[in-house]
């Protein structure tokens, strides 16, 4: 698919170098954890929020296919402009009234921030209505491992189990349970300690849920500041933006084209 999106050659050189630098570190850490296994089993999710479509096109032309966005409208607009074999991941705070708009995106691959039964049901219902022939959306349940009030996510066992129950029910056909996701606290992510306790908490939730429901959940944890430790503690995915694209502009100055 030709998008007609052009880009600067200097920016291309810079972005590819930065992407490959991060990829190299991810692979090196993964090989230490997954001995004799393919290090590419760790997904490097490229977080492209507030970055122009031209930056995404550069990395797409380099072979990258999975990108993460934090804002519903931005994801929708970029999905219309960019190749339709991109796998879009929504990783921002999810509002129930935005589930319908998200579900309309045919190549929406994943929603990583399900934090209530109501949102899970609304997303399933909306996908069934607007894109019933597309693949089910892979979903992560967001866990608030740091118990910070300003953070989204569940930490109540009954509520978590209720959401998992729905995903495994006959009713839930258009979205699919993939794993658990967390955003650790800033302070913990910047501590010079051997183990990130927020990540350790997510690992414990995985063990508890897998034991109760017979699942085999994947973990999504780790961003630019703490992805190395996340890999060591068992994540299947790291979400990296700044280390690849550089600093983000203020939201009111960001442009899609």
Swiss-Prot record:
Other information: Present with 4890 molecules/cell in log phase SD medium.
Modified residues (N6-(pyridoxal phosphate)lysine): 49
Taxonomic lineage: Eukaryota, Fungi, Dikarya, Ascomycota, Saccharomycotina
Gene Ontology cellular-component annotations: cytoplasm; nucleus
One of the protein's GO biological processes: vitamin B6 metabolic process
Highest taxon in the source lineage: Eukaryota
GO molecular function: pyridoxal phosphate binding
InterPro entries per the UniProt record, alphabetical: Ala_racemase_N (IPR001608), PLP-binding_barrel (IPR029066), PyrdxlP_homeostasis (IPR011078)
Protein's cellular compartments: Cytoplasm; Nucleus
UniProt similarity note: Belongs to the pyridoxal phosphate-binding protein YggS/PROSC family.
Keywords recorded for this protein, A-Z: Acetylation, Cytoplasm, Nucleus, Pyridoxal phosphate
Described purpose of this protein according to its UniProt entry: Pyridoxal 5'-phosphate (PLP)-binding protein, which may be involved in intracellular homeostatic regulation of pyridoxal 5'-phosphate (PLP), the active form of vitamin B6.
Record-linked HAMAP family: PLP_homeostasis
Stated name of the protein: Pyridoxal phosphate homeostasis protein
N-acetylserine: residues bearing it: 2
Family annotation (PANTHER family): PROLINE SYNTHETASE CO-TRANSCRIBED BACTERIAL HOMOLOG PROTEIN (PTHR10146), PYRIDOXAL PHOSPHATE HOMEOSTASIS PROTEIN (PTHR10146:SF14)
Ribosomal protein keyword on record: no
SUPFAM superfamilies on file: PLP-binding barrel
